[in-house]
């Protein structure tokens, strides 16, 4: 989400020159997994990333690229999937996608149609592996069961909402992932910046202007504050930043393969990479976790193309 033309929803994104600089530094630091979507920046995120890779990456095998499909007029119909993969490949200037993720569950088309179409992409070598995002456990199990029944490619990863102040995935999803031999690439691992600073610190543009993230976290700020205070305590104790501690916590979880973290400043990228110098003790982790109380589940119900929840009284 950090790359692409500025939009009303995400006005803080990086232009092409800034994208080049950010990706160049990321590659220098050893980062090789990049996540985007056909809808980010109205498609320009894929374009900017593709342009940067063309200039900076000598061997395509040195990077792992994930992109997503769902937000289009056909959602996850076979026709829409076949059309959208061609658009993503063109914008990214690539012959294949390493990890192709369905961005949401499609309540309007049979999962059999979706999984068959995705399997055809794998067979045609336009996609190497399949992932999913923002799904309930029953949906993931249904999708993989359908694929298994027909001998089709299954999902190997899920990109769900998970961080130190939102741990509802620990109820059922993580146990299912263990059984399915899948991994997580959690989105919002830093809770849109809420676990990177104390509430009275300077507020970033995203914290104040991102309506979706305000709805996700603002209602729970009172029950989250004690945890955020403990993050600050641990950070001060081990001479780290709060962001590093929060990311170290999520990286301590065995099924987390790669948290999805976005940056708008190279200094943020460099600081976060220092997380690999940090190791939280078992006592630190227990101290950070023991105050957690159940949260209202961020819904993943049927949504319209303009991303409005059909249950407006819930948070999206």
State where each predicted segment sits.
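Conserved beta-strand positions
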Residues: 36, 67, 99-102, 132, ...
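Short, well-ordered coil/turn segments that N-cap beta-strands
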Residues: 30-32, 59-63, 94-98, 124-128, ...
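N-terminal binding-site loop/beta-alpha segment at the start of enzyme catalytic domains
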Residues: 1-63, 95, 123, 191
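Conserved, mostly hydrophobic/aromatic
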Residues: 19, 34, 49, 65, ...
